[in-house]
Design a protein with these regions (language model features):
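C-terminal transmembrane helical hairpin of 12-TM major facilitator-type secondary transporters
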Residues: 305-339
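Central cavity-lining transmembrane alpha-helices of secondary-active solute carriers
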Residues: 75-93, 282-294
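Conserved MFS/SLC helix-loop-helix module at the cytosolic interface between two early adjacent transmembrane helices
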Residues: 86-126, 131
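Helix-loop-helix hairpin linking two adjacent transmembrane segments in secondary transporters
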Residues: 162-163, 170-222
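Extracytoplasmic
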Residues: 30-61, 153, 261-269
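Cytoplasmic helix-loop-helix junction between adjacent transmembrane helices
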Residues: 137-174
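Extracytoplasmic gate region of multi-pass secondary transporters
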Residues: 49-50, 240-290
Length: 339
């Protein structure tokens, strides 16, 4: 049958993706750890952008157009989210066409090239060219960010079909771990009065390592291909599953409550609560790292939907409390509830 033929085609040539059950345990561990590194890299990048936002404004945009400099920061940070949304939306849909290896190589190159472009903009005179270099560089890192999410989630699900919840929780714990590392490194660079561009050089390191690991790894096909489900059938299933649309919009709101506020914590709160906002971001991310390791057992006790409901409630209370905090102690209490 057509489905059986598609299932047979899942075992492709050695140069291409293969069925997950033909991959050796050692290679599976390598794929899992390079996925963790990729998630760590995007968390690190999140912290780096928070670290350098004020420096971009002070060293480049203020000299270019003082009246619009704050808006320019918003525009270039926004470019990151545009790139993230594009590759997450279209990259996920086209993953079987391009392959997980190409997707993750693209992510590594995006972070490498994007970081170099922002450094280049910092080294040249303030001009419209410098602005567009920063914009293009952060857009590239955003495209890489989305490519990581589009590639690593189905990769881990494919190699550990019987441990999905556990393995995916561990995988996504490396996102806040990257933020903690990036935030602390940024604080250290500032305390030592070192150039802020070093934040971007640090971000290049995991990108280079990731590219090397991905280039020499053997990747599986996705679960859809392995099961023999057709491409068109996959999209038709969306229309037959109203619950998918509910979770789609729920995820949009989740991203809104986590990603956007987190990116602006340092720039928005540093002058309001009497402390560096990046410290709050590091603290919240550390809480996330710990809680994500316990998410599996909690979900089993209260159900995934129940856990999401309680998490949303705490996030709403925490974000509102953070918006009205005016000193360090209330800010830390609000951040604890949010995290």
């Amino acid at each position: 049958s057509e489905r059986e033929n598609r299932r047979v085609s899942a075992n492709e040539t050695p140069a291409g993706p293969v069925a997950a059950d033909t991959i050796e345990p050692g290679m599976k561990r390598r794929l899992f750890w390079l996925s963790n590194l990729a998630i760590f890299m995007i968390g690190l990048g999140f912290a780096v952008r928070a670290n350098i936002a004020a420096d971009l404004q002070g060293d480049i945009f203020n000299l270019l157009d003082l009246a619009r400099s704050a808006s320019m920061v918003g525009e270039v940070i926004g470019a990151t989210f545009i790139g993230f949304a594009l590759t997450l939306l279209f990259g996920s849909a086209l993953l079987d066409r391009v392959g997980m290896k190409v997707m993750l190589l693209f992510a590594a190159v995006g972070y490498l090239a994007g970081s170099v472009m922002v450094i280049a903009a910092a080294l040249m005179e303030a001009s419209s060219s410098a602005y567009w270099l920063v914009y293009g560089g952060l857009l590239l890192t955003g495209l890489g960010w989305g490519a990581v999410e589009a590639g690593t989630n189905p990769l881990v699900a494919a190699i550990y079909p019987d441990e999905k919840t556990h393995r995916l929780n561990i995988l996504h714990a490396w996102w806040p771990a990257g933020i903690v590392a990036g935030g602390l490194l940024g604080l250290a660079l500032g305390a030592l009065s070192l150039p802020w561009e070093l934040n971007l050089l640090i971000l290049i390191l995991p990108a280079v390592v990731l590219a090397a690991l991905v280039a020499t790894a053997k990747f599986p096909v996705t679960e859809r291909v392995a099961a023999g489900v057709g491409y068109g059938e996959m999209f038709r299933e969306i229309g037959r599953s109203p619950g998918f649309l509910i979770w789609f919009f729920a995820m949009m709101m989740t991203a809104t409550s986590e990603l956007a506020p987190g990116q602006w914590v340092d720039l928005a709160l540093s002058n309001v609560v009497g402390m560096q906002g990046i410290i709050l971001l590091v603290y919240v991310s550390a809480l996330m790292f710990v809680m994500r390791h316990f998410a599996g057992p909690l979900a089993e006790r209260v159900s995934p939907v129940g856990l999401l409901w309680f998490s949303s409630l705490f996030a709403a209370i925490g974000l509102y409390s953070l918006s009205v905090a005016s000193s360090p102690l209330p800010a830390f209490i609000a951040a604890t509830i949010w995290g």
